[in-house]
Amino acid sequence: MSIDETTAGHIQELRRGTVVLACLVRLRRPDYGYALLESLNALGIIVDANTLYPLLRRLEKQGLLTSEWNTEEARPRKFYRTSPAGEALADVLTTDWRRIDGALAGLTTGDDR
């Protein structure tokens, strides 16, 4: 395995957990899958559609998202929204993210007393 493949693998691993948090936070405002994908990518959270759609279904099955179909437009779209359980998880994950971010900031700046 080359260094580039190794690096890519570690980057993918690092991003994997952040996508759940990003979806839960972003879907506090209801949206459909493709718009969510575009929104996350615009923010620099690069997600592939083949990753996002199964994740949305899994989060819905776990009760962390709710969904409903909007058939008012020419093309029906499934809109997702963070559920109360998803809100609670987002709060826990955000707190932990901030803790980890602070710890890593200390490590990378040499302030890791």
Each model region followed by its residue ranges:
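Beta-hairpin "wing" of winged helix-turn-helix
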Residues: 62-75, 81
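Basic, amphipathic "hinge/linker" alpha-helix immediately C-terminal to the N-terminal HTH DNA-binding motif
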Residues: 76-93
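N-terminal helix-turn-helix DNA-binding core of bacterial DNA-binding proteins
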Residues: 11-53
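Alpha-helical DNA-recognition elements
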Residues: 58
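Short, Lys/Arg-enriched N-terminal segment that forms or immediately precedes the first helix
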Residues: 1-12
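Amphipathic alpha-helical dimerization/coiled-coil segments
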Residues: 88-113
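Short, aromatic/basic-enriched loop-to-helix "N-cap" motif that marks the start
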Residues: 49, 75-76
